[in-house]
């Protein structure tokens, strides 16, 4: 019965975006939703960056390019209305510019993680959510035997 249920599970979705950094596709720090709109959390993913370039994960329009709290920030708006923000970055594109998927749009700057990384945030209808699905880094859920866990 469990095997049949497993076979009926939908496949893990494939990436719809390209990976925005060079080198290994590795999440250094995961998304953590805040418990309230202004509460603490981690509103994005930190991705390892083995090379200097930031690549556009999808096509869109640069909606912001500048500094926020002393860090370089670059935001793309997709045709679907998603906002993708990156920091810290030295932008190589300007506000209003159209960008293509895979285009070099910036240089990764130090200062966010102990090792080279870029923070990517995703907003949909004004709310932050994890960009794992678009990047294809979702992990399939696994059912574990109930006897391995204490209840209550």
Predicted regions mapped to residue ranges:
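Surface-exposed, glycine-biased beta-strand/turn segments
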Residues: 2-73, 100-101, 129-133, 137-152
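A generic structural motif
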Residues: 48, 77-79, 123
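Short, surface-exposed secondary-structure edge patches
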Residues: 51-54, 89-97
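Zn2+-dependent peptidoglycan hydrolase active-site motif and core
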Residues: 57-92, 116-119
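A short hydrophobic beta-strand segment most commonly corresponding to one strand
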Residues: 119-127
């Amino acid at each position: 019965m469990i095997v049949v249920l497993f076979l009926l599970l939908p496949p893990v979705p494939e990436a719809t975006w390209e990976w925005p950094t060079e080198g290994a596709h590795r999440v250094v720090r995961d998304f953590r939703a805040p418990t309230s709109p202004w509460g603490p959390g981690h509103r994005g993913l930190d991705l390892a960056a083995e090379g200097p370039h930031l690549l556009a994960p999808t096509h869109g329009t640069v909606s912001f390019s500048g500094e926020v709290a002393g860090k370089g920030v670059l935001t793309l708006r997709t045709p679907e209305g998603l906002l993708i923000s990156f920091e810290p970055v030295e932008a190589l594109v300007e506000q209003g510019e159209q960008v293509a998927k895979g285009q070099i749009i910036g240089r990764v700057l130090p200062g966010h993680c102990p090792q080279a990384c870029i923070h990517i945030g995703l907003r949909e209808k004004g709310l932050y959510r994890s960009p794992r699905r678009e990047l294809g880094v979702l992990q399939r859920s696994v059912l574990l035997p109930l006897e391995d866990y204490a209840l209550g």
